[in-house]
From Swiss-Prot:
It comes from the Bacteria. The lineage of its organism: Bacteria, Bacillati, Bacillota, Bacilli, Bacillales. InterPro entries: ExoRNase_PH_dom1, ExoRNase_PH_dom2, ExoRNase_PH_dom2_sf, PNPase/RNase_PH_dom_sf, Ribosomal_Su5_D2-typ_SF, RNase_PH, RNase_PH_bac-type, RNase_PH_CS. Phosphate binds at residues 86, 124-126. This is Ribonuclease PH. Its EC number is 2.7.7.56. It is an enzyme of class 2 (transferase). SUPFAM superfamilies: Ribonuclease PH domain 2-like (SSF55666), Ribosomal protein S5 domain 2-like (SSF54211). The gene is rph.
Length: 248
């Protein structure tokens, strides 16, 4: 049994509140246990300079944390005048993951910005951001589709992310909270599509190694968790949008 009473293969309680903000084309509040992230999607009718005139779209992401999202206050990055390496890495990860399931040609010459703002952190902020940002992005694209239907719906598949790890006394586990993540011998983030394809695997031994058997166990746990997350996404988005993603 884990510190919060979960079994090794159990996600934390997932709660998604759609249309959490009134202004963005798509938005959700996603809660993964005590980790809470607001994800919003904004549509711009322009693309980055390097893509102008190509007729293709772009997906980009920004990530930030409230100063007191953690147990001690952090200085706002805007006050420092620069984005930290960690933030830059996570922003690129979110954007890269979302672009993997979007047909940028079908999107047309527009940019969708995903803003992921962590209001409370208890481990897994980047994976929660990806899972929530996907829902917000699809909501925004669905609104465009309602205005002028796409010949081909730009979203090709579902996408979700979770964490897995190896604990000294608990073995392989799914969806680590902060206490578990801090003590983990191995920490891995897994991003997958609804069809079971991998988008990214980020795994690291923390002063430890892991075996091929443990790797297989971690991947199996991740696949189980992501499958459950995608079912939640489908429930939030509804049958009509789910059918559009499936090409029906």
């Amino acid at each position: 049994m884990r510190v919060d009473g979960r079994e090794k293969n159990a996600l934390r309680k997932i709660e998604v509140t759609p249309d959490y903000l009134m202004h963005p084309e798509g938005s959700v509040l996603i809660a993964s246990g005590n980790t809470k992230v607001i994800c919003s999607a904004s549509v711009e009718t322009k693309v980055p300079p390097f893509m102008r005139g190509e007729g293709r779209g772009w997906i980009s992401a920004e990530y930030s944390m409230l100063p007191r999202a953690t147990n001690t206050r952090n200085i706002r990055e805007s006050s420092k005048g620069k984005v930290t390496g960690r933030t830059m890495e996570i922003q690129r990860l979110i954007g890269r993951a979302l672009r993997a399931v979007v047909d940028l040609d079908a999107l047309g010459e527009r940019t969708i910005w995903l803003d992921c703002d962590v209001i409370q952190a208890d481990g897994g902020t980047r994976t929660a951001s990806i899972t929530g940002a996907f829902i917000a992005m699809v909501m925004a694209i669905a609104k465009l589709d309602e205005q002028v239907p796409f010949t081909k719906f730009p979203v090709k598949d579902f996408l979700a992310a979770t964490s897995v790890g190896v604990l000294e006394e608990g073995g392989t586990v799914l969806d680590l909270n902060y206490i578990e993540d801090s003590a983990a011998q191995v920490d891995m983030n897994i991003i997958m599509t609804g069809s079971g394809a991998f988008v990214e695997l980020q795994g690291t031994g923390e002063e430890a190694t892991f075996s091929e058997t443990e790797l297989a166990e971690l991947i199996a746990l991740g696949k189980k968790g992501i499958s459950e997350l995608i079912e939640i996404q489908k429930e939030i988005l509804g049958d009509k949008i789910t059918a559009r993603i499936k090409g029906e």
